[in-house]
Design a protein with these regions (language model features):
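Glycine-rich phosphate-binding active-site loops on the catalytic face of alpha/beta enzymes
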Residues: 164-180, 219-226, 267-285
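Catalytic cores of alpha/beta
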Residues: 154-165, 204-212, 253-270
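N-terminal active-site wall of soluble small-molecule enzyme domains
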Residues: 89, 96-197, 203-208, 234-237
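Short, Lys/Arg-enriched N-terminal segments with co-localized hydrophobic residues
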Residues: 16-33
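C-terminal helical cap(s) of enzyme catalytic domains, especially alpha/beta-barrels
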Residues: 237-240, 278-291
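An N-cap/entry alpha-helix motif that binds or orients negatively charged groups
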Residues: 32-100
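Conserved, mostly hydrophobic/aromatic
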Residues: 39, 87, 112, 162, ...
């Protein structure tokens, strides 16, 4: 009898511990979502204003006039042997504030291309990153390598818009989309000849990305609660992504040792922003990271 009571108490205690862990997880996620939700809410307001200026039907019509047989150059750039480098053109960020007071974005993009970047990530989010659609359009005219539109996609409108301003890929963030939206937006991007970089922060979001049919999964190493970065997040979550799915590590890579650690773990590409943006010699900085 005593043994039975002990077993029951142990079982109940274990369940309570599991419940506590789940509550801690949900509380932490809510803190992170608050930041993303604020930016996403701003994006929704931006889309509403954009629709007034150019209706969705017109945005769709313009996108469908473009050739959808693109060959998905962004995906091809990441699928090549060895580590691929997505270099970011970014003026500011919520975590670091103003990064580049002087922001010669076209010149930066040209430097990245000359340095051997495989693709360029261009921030177009205006409220928190001081980005503009025009940055991407002008960079598109100046370089030949693929461009990722780095923004907070909250509406199908933004996917058609991305195609029309010259992007080769869009960012889809699991934390601000429902599973249905993620699946739908991934499909729309594919129909337009755009690649979708589906961003996850944890195990649940990786599973969500895979369920939506993502062919490129990116893991953000930044903790959105306190803005610290830990590339072990990518090392840990890489194991959940099948080898036939391209894997991108985002944020926090500062040294050749960081890159080597990710190479050993089967990472296909890294997205690097601040480290390169703060470098006076971007070609030398990228060469050092490549090793």
């Amino acid at each position: 009898m005593h043994d039975k009571v002990s077993r029951v108490l142990l079982t109940c205690g274990a369940r309570i511990l599991d419940l506590d862990r789940n509550l801690d997880y949900e509380t932490e996620r809510q803190d992170e979502w608050m930041i993303l939700d604020t930016i996403a809410a701003s994006a929704k307001e931006r889309v509403a204003a954009a629709k007034e200026a150019l209706p969705l039907t017109e945005q769709i019509a313009r996108a469908r006039e473009l050739d959808s047989n693109t060959g998905f150059p962004f995906e091809q750039a990441l699928a090549k042997p060895g580590m691929s480098f997505i270099c970011e053109a970014k003026k500011a960020s919520p975590s670091k504030g103003l990064i580049a007071p002087e922001f010669p974005y076209v010149q930066i993009a040209k430097e990245y291309e000359a340095a051997g970047a495989d693709a360029i990530s261009v921030l177009t989010e205006p409220a928190y990153f001081q980005g503009k659609n025009e940055y991407l359009t002008e960079i598109r005219q100046a370089v030949k390598i693929p461009l990722l539109r780095k923004d907070f996609t909250v509406d199908e409108y933004m996917i058609y818009e991305a195609r029309n301003i010259g992007a080769d890929a869009v960012l889809l963030i699991c934390a601000i989309l429902s599973p249905m939206q993620l699946s739908e937006y991934t499909g729309i991007a594919g129909e337009l000849g755009l690649s979708a970089l589906v961003e996850a922060h944890d195990e649940r979001e990786v599973e969500m990305a895979l369920a939506a049919g993502a062919s490129i999964v990116g893991v953000n190493n930044r903790n959105l609660k306190d803005f610290t970065v830990d590339i072990h997040n990518s090392v840990r979550l890489r194991e959940l992504v099948p080898e036939n799915i391209l894997f991108v590590s985002e944020s926090g890579m500062k040294t050749r040792q960081d890159i080597a650690r990710l190479e050993q773990n089967g990472t296909n590409a890294v997205l690097i922003g601040e480290t390169l943006m703060r470098s006076a010699d971007k070609k030398a900085a990228l060469r050092e990271l490549r090793g």
